[in-house]
């Protein structure tokens, strides 16, 4: 192994380690990796005097941000917003009501719609649109939302595999394949290999992934609809019913004990028993604001302040009955809200929200104190801090109080998803027709190779803007900028894998270890390894690292790279074991009331089924 190869391997291992650690967001980690390569290249060239360094060219280190894959991912997100604005999605979801009477049909109808929508728009956006619909219909029919939301999230992920634009890994695989094969065509020494695989094959089109991705989506949707939801742990199921449609029973808020409170003189244990265990007191707030764990035998005294875990509906009843009050600062902020339409709204922190990693102070500054944070609910890990010290995470459910118009405005600007019954907004029929026609035209231009996918989608965006379907204020709102930065930074890192020859070294090692194994098993192994990585790090980063390795293995074996690239595409999109593996999984964590360990119960059998079902299908449509 050369010095350059060792450096690239060290950087990639470091990137994977930082991804798994989770201290910094994935886009920051990707930039750290890119910058590390640039610094290493400067040292190798300027200090070690190795002018032939193949690490990375510092002058073109940022070229990844102009890569077609990056532009295509951003364009798909913008088009998703335009389709939502036109009313197309709402028109589809309005047809789901008749199917909600039967539980299996209820789950199946939501999952099918989610999968179809995710094939043509961002899967997180599709899930966000269907989440309120799922919660509303589950409540109306007395079903636990936990039985609905995990199948719905998994179906959104599965649907993205059907088309080239459905998920970032497919876009990455498609563009990487074109660039790699073109590079080979320019190398005389690769002529024998190209002749063996039948020359340079055509580019992957819009539906090139459909034979495999469609089967995976079909298998997955049938599984989660018929079997999967039955595997969700019973202790993860939220109670059902209209009164608790969106209410989580683990909200954290602050209360104080006034002079007239009936709890004075009782022990904390007696207070919890008196409330029917509906309120758990888990923190005592000292005068300096610090929180300590209280003794259950401590007596309640006037003026004491506590952190409690309680359902908001139960808290109101307890306050009315006992005289318990909200903490003074919280109460004063509520009293300062003016307006007749003051109410409570529950919102979920989405992956794109500016609140992620921020505290209540940031929320107050962004909303000009027009919205009050009443409580926070988080699944998996208890919150042992005061509300002002809590750092928000993806999937947290926030209970906000304020004027309804203010809450809706700030929820939209901060990318918070309201968990409230919403009226289905049906766009003007002509706008729906035009929006669909423009999108279909863009796809046809790409399918028939009249125009590259990236440019045809940019043309569609311009049409949406000119026709008023996509207001300028919404133009960049839906773009997932951390993913864009991740892709732009990781593409040069992926290129360094190839330019230093490290992919060849890894491929040789793999072939030596698997020389006695049949070729199909190597495809399956590559898929499984990719799946494992995708469960703990971003799927786009996984595809960028594993695609060159898959191609290197194919080159060593002297076979077509397509089955290996398809295995990477499928594996990178299958992140079903943890809530951190995919943004869709994180989005339902709070509303579904799931624990961290609930995902693998359904996700592991699903991933096994996908490997068993997809490998033969890959080899049928993409033979060696």
Regions found by a protein language model. Name each.
Residues 22, 264-312, 358, 364-401:
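Cytosolic Rossmann-like ligand/nucleotide-binding regulatory domains
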Residues 15-24, 113-122, 154-165, 444-450, ...:
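Transmembrane alpha-helix interface/packing and boundary motifs in multi-pass membrane proteins
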Residues 235-255, 320-350, 417-443:
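Long, charged amphipathic helices and adjacent flexible linkers at domain junctions
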Residues 45-144, 221-225, 229, 471-557:
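Membrane-embedded alpha-helical segments and adjacent helix-loop junctions characteristic
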Residues 104-116, 143-159, 188-209, 519-532, ...:
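Alpha-helical transmembrane segments of multi-pass membrane proteins
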Residues 391-424:
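Extended, hydrophilic extramembrane loops/domains of integral membrane proteins
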Residues 4-16, 23-54, 66-78, 129, ...:
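Hydrophobic mid-bilayer segments of alpha-helices in multi-pass membrane transport proteins
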Residues 140-230, 585-617:
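Membrane-core helix-loop-helix motifs of multi-pass transport proteins
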